[in-house]
């Protein structure tokens, strides 16, 4: 069901269990993992990540436990259509876990500034929902970045990705970059 959710399609990518083995189908045809894109393989890995967490548990009970979720660059290698599906899927999954237990923590890392802004909006909405559900406890989230081998607060207001890249290129051209 997760693959349908991400691709907005019944047959786009599917995994079926047949004759004691798993079969990968793309648009109804058997394919090997090497025959699908890197982005599609990453989507399968992310779906497996969440499915594995809930293994041998009832759906309702699986989110009530405390978790630390760590997701590294969930939308790398995706075209725009898959990016929309994966961000929607992430919002849904993170919502289940964060609303399931006030102590659950979710760390999502990315190198892409546009993805960061999308995740920022998702987290703002999820935090608001969590604060409504857990009225006595207030959830918060941190926006952090690693720069020059240090982790610091991410100054995201008035920051433009292309401007930042041009500054880095300029400093490199002057020999000032590390």
Label every model-predicted segment.
Residues 64, 77-80, 84:
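Conserved D-loop-proximal element of ABC-family nucleotide-binding domains
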Residues 59-64, 68-73:
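Catalytic Walker B motif of ABC-type/P-loop ATPase nucleotide-binding domains
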Residues 1-16:
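Amphipathic alpha-helical domain-onset/packing element
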Residues 23-51, 74-80:
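Conserved ABC ATPase signature
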Residues 52-59, 97-98:
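Post-Walker A helix-loop "phosphate-sensing" segment adjacent to the P-loop in P-loop NTPases
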Residues 12-14, 42, 67-68, 104-107, ...:
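Beta-sheet entry/capping signal
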Residues 39, 63-65, 101-103:
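Short loop/turn elements that form and flank the Walker-type P-loop nucleotide-binding site
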Residues 85-178:
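C-terminal lobe/lid and adjacent interdomain/linker elements of RecA-like ASCE P-loop ATPase modules
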């Amino acid at each position: 069901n997760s693959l349908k959710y991400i691709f907005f399609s019944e047959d786009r990518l599917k995994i079926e269990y047949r004759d004691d083995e798993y079969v990968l189908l793309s648009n109804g045809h058997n394919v090997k993992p090497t025959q699908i894109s890197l982005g599609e393989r990453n989507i399968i890995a992310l779906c497996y990540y969440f499915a594995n967490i809930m293994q041998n548990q009832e759906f309702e009970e699986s989110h009530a436990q405390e978790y630390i979720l760590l997701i590294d660059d969930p939308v790398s290698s995706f075209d725009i259509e898959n990016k929309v599906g994966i961000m929607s899927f992430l919002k849904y999954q993170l919502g289940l876990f964060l609303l399931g237990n006030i102590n659950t923590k979710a760390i999502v890392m990315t190198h892409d500034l546009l993805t960061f802004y999308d995740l920022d909006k998702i987290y703002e909405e999820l935090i608001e929902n969590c604060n409504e559900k857990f009225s006595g406890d207030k959830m918060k989230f941190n926006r952090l970045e690693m720069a020059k081998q240090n982790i610091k607060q991410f100054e995201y207001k008035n920051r433009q990705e292309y401007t930042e890249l041009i500054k880095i290129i300029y400093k490199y051209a002057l020999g000032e970059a590390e």
